[in-house]
UniProtKB/Swiss-Prot annotation:
Any GO BP annotation: mitochondrial electron transport, ubiquinol to cytochrome c
Gene: UQCRB
Alphabetical UniProt keywords: Acetylation, Electron transport, Membrane, Mitochondrion, Mitochondrion inner membrane, Respiratory chain, Transport
Modified positions (N-acetylalanine) in chain numbering: A2
Organism field: Pongo abelii
N6-succinyllysine PTM sites in chain numbering: K12, K78
Family: Belongs to the UQCRB/QCR7 family.
Compartmental location: Mitochondrion inner membrane
Full protein name: Cytochrome b-c1 complex subunit 7
Length: 111
């Protein structure tokens, strides 16, 4: 029982650190999501290309709005900030698929 409490306490502590970092990074104040800020290497570019049109358009809207706010040295009103609890990693499944396919191609190339 004591072990479960220790795991629960460390999980809450780690979640608190994640929330703090999410807010400290500042991208949420511009309305961006975490996946909007990922460095675009070849795998990420391919994953973005595979996004459904509505997700791609939402991403482009957030990025363009963030650029506009940044140029004006402004941030969104607090009620429009992206919240940690509402974050969805929309690019992750597509990125995992692209990486899996690339690794599979590399394995085939070795044979």
């Amino acid at each position: 029982m004591a072990g479960k409490q220790a795991v629960s306490a460390s999980g809450k502590w780690l979640d608190g650190i994640r929330k703090w970092y999410y807010n400290a990074a500042g991208f949420n104040k511009l309305g961006l999501m975490r996946d909007d800020t990922i460095y675009e290497d070849e795998d990420v570019k391919e994953a973005i290309r595979r996004l459904p049109e509505n997700l791609y358009n939402d991403r482009m809207f957030r990025i363009k709005r963030a650029l506009d706010l940044s140029l004006k040295h402004q941030i969104l009103p607090k009620e429009q900030w992206t919240k940690y609890e509402e974050e969805n990693f929309y690019l992750e499944p597509y990125l995992k698929e692209v990486i899996r396919e690339r690794k599979e191609r590399e394995e085939w190339a070795k044979k």
